């Protein structure tokens, strides 16, 4: 359930962002298009940097225990419909995921590729964004005894370092978006 909601959420977020921004920038050409597209990518990049800074400052300090979000505790007990809804909400509404998906959609909108290229790009992004989740789910389903201890250690490491990992990802994504935005000008 969670994985289905996650994949649908990723596809919906990137597709909707691409569609809306394509409609907004579609009739524009020349200087107007370059200004709007450049500012759009700069805004996505700067927002990613702001969120990265917030995540870095909110990370647990040495000696303090990190807290998993409250939604993470209820995933295992959720029925398939609730798990799907949770996956969809997390893929579309979490600040980091929203920025990464909106950035991908914005890039697809301003690049103006053919429809089939957009379709394949969105599907590729959904596969990549879901692959780690799929590995964990398949591992638990088919080899729970073998993967439980390593995944437990991984979860402990993520608890301690999640803020730093998210900050690094958002810094890189923000840098790419800013670079694209500056390149358009």
Placement of each model-derived feature along the sequence:
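A small-residue-rich subset of transmembrane alpha-helices
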Residues: 1-25, 107-148
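Structural signal for alpha-helical transmembrane segments and their flanking helix-loop junctions
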Residues: 1, 69-134
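A short structural micro-motif
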Residues: 7, 157, 174-175
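Hydrophobic residues within the alpha-helical transmembrane core of Major Facilitator Superfamily
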Residues: 4, 49, 88-89, 127, ...
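Juxtamembrane boundary at the C-terminal end of a transmembrane helix
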Residues: 175-185
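Membrane helix-loop-helix hairpins that form the core translocation module of multi-pass transporters
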Residues: 1-69
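Interfacial loop-to-helix junctions that mark the boundaries of transmembrane helices
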Residues: 4, 26-41, 116-124, 158-162, ...
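Alpha-helical multi-pass membrane helix bundles of inner-membrane/thylakoid proteins
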Residues: 36-40, 47-95, 152-168, 185
